[in-house]
Amino acid sequence: MKLKNGFVLRKMPGMNLVLPAGENIKTYKGALMLNDTAAFIYELLQEGLDSAVIRVRMLDEYDVTPEKAEEGINKTFALLVEGGVAEE
């Protein structure tokens, strides 16, 4: 999973938004709203980490089973691809 260039994560009280930046402002309309877990995964993707490392970090950060962590990662990846801010 790789994030596309031209998007930024903005954290505000109660919400996390992925917004277009630079040239993307002209073509990408709207914003992608993420929950706190998805924002955590997005930040790890910004660091260039792969899904295996993200899974380990999820297990360290949250009290979830490995299966639940994997499910959350897969859902977030799908959301980011659907939203046009990432590619597989």
Question: Residue ranges of each PLM-predicted region?
Answer:
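Long, charge-rich, low-complexity alpha-helical segments
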Residues: 30-88
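Acidic, low-complexity/disordered tracts enriched in E/D and polar residues
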Residues: 1-46
